Amino acid sequence: MTFALPDNATLSLFLLPLLVFFARIIDVSIGTLRIIFVARSLKGWAGVLGFFESLIWVLAISQVMQNLTNVWTYIAFALGFATGNYVGVLIEERIAIGSLIVRIITRKDATVLTEHLWKAGYGVTNLQAHGETGPVRLIFTVCRRRDVKDVLRMVKQFNPRAFYTIEDVRFVQDNLPVVPRRHGIMSRLALRNRK
């Protein structure tokens, strides 16, 4: 039994657009992560990712330019870009780099909530404040992005009617741990790059 290899026209028409599509998914996903690393001051990782992003982009665009008569390479290039943005955001959500500040405002007594947050290892600042309807408790806690669901679970369990906002934190003082848990590789790299 012999297999016939596809001719150049078949390769150019079908296989090349597929390769361009996947190359764009990879380079745009890398670009999304690179931008996030730049925002988080992870300069070394941003540089390495930038190198591979541009290398893959040059390879993809050169194939499009060499095959200007194949409209499928244009479509693959654009679809790869769109898909790469989506995949890049999914990857970023999965690795969840960085810290967040959760601001909780509640009219209900927040003693139980703050105690559970402290027991879970989160630093908590609890202030008396005054809102439109009277006295409120204002609670601040800084957590890693991957731990925000845990914090919100506690808020909903102990103060289900509390109002909360979540914001990105660019920098957390090194000697104050966000959560005293085992650090992953990205956390260790971020701490090393700040020094």
UniProtKB/Swiss-Prot annotation:
Disulfide bonds: none
Keywords: Cell membrane, Membrane, Transmembrane, Transmembrane helix
Pfam families noted in UniProt: DUF2179, DUF5698
Keyword Transmembrane helix: yes
Family of the protein in this entry: Belongs to the UPF0316 family.
Keyword Membrane: yes
Highest taxon of the lineage: Bacteria
Protein name: UPF0316 protein Pcar_2434
Cellular component per GO, a single term: plasma membrane
Listed PANTHER family: UPF0316 PROTEIN YEBE
Species assigned in the record: Syntrophotalea carbinolica (strain DSM 2380 / NBRC 103641 / GraBd1) (Pelobacter carbinolicus)
Compartments reported by the entry: Cell membrane
Membrane-spanning parts: 13-33, 45-65, 71-91
Membrane topology: Multi-pass membrane protein
HAMAP family linked: UPF0316
